[in-house]
Amino acid sequence: PAGNRVGMTNSDGVYVDNLRIDTGDCSGPRSARSVLMHPDVDAAVFETARGGILREGLAFDRCNVAIVTNIGMGDHLGLGYISTVEDLAVVKRVIVQHVHPSGTAVLNAADPIVAEMASSCPGSITYFAEDRNHPVMATHRAQGQRAVYRDGDAIVAAQGAEETRYPL
């Protein structure tokens, strides 16, 4: 085939190669395992909900990429002894802790709780933020590391001083 056939789970369903094969909230480990075992899937993308992590753990031992966009503003509190945003961050950090050493965690530099998860990642870190000059990202880039930000009508992927623009 020309490219990878992607399996994906999220709160709307399960998809294989852009075809929905299940509907409903499929952001838990059972749906993720079904994608991992699907014979037509070459690569997988999972929305990983905190409830599933608390009830059943992760559906995988290691991942190549983990993305944490935010922790939320408390709308997911009250399940499984999760009573503060910091408690919720501990749960979401589990995904970052399971990045393969050759993998990458993509973390929101503008959210201090998310940015701090970098210390738990066995792989590399890519930070993102709206502000290209965010201090966390600026320090990271100055060390020759990767960062992503929006610049007008483009997304910019940078590593150190090198930048690649992707028009929106």
Predicted features along the sequence, with ranges:
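Alpha-helix C-cap/termination motif
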Residues: A2, H38-P39, H98, S120
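Conserved nucleotide-sensing/catalytic segment adjacent to the nucleotide-binding pocket
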Residues: L19-E56
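Short, basic, glycine/proline-bearing loop/turn elements
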Residues: V14-I21, V41-A43, G72-Y81
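Generic beta-strand/beta-sheet core signal
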Residues: T9, F46-E47, N108, F128
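Hydrophobic anchor at the start of a short beta-strand
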Residues: R5-V6, A43, A105, I125
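Acidic, Mg2+-coordinating active-site environments of NTP-dependent enzymes
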Residues: R55-L168
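Positions that flank functional sites
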Residues: G13-V14, G51, N133
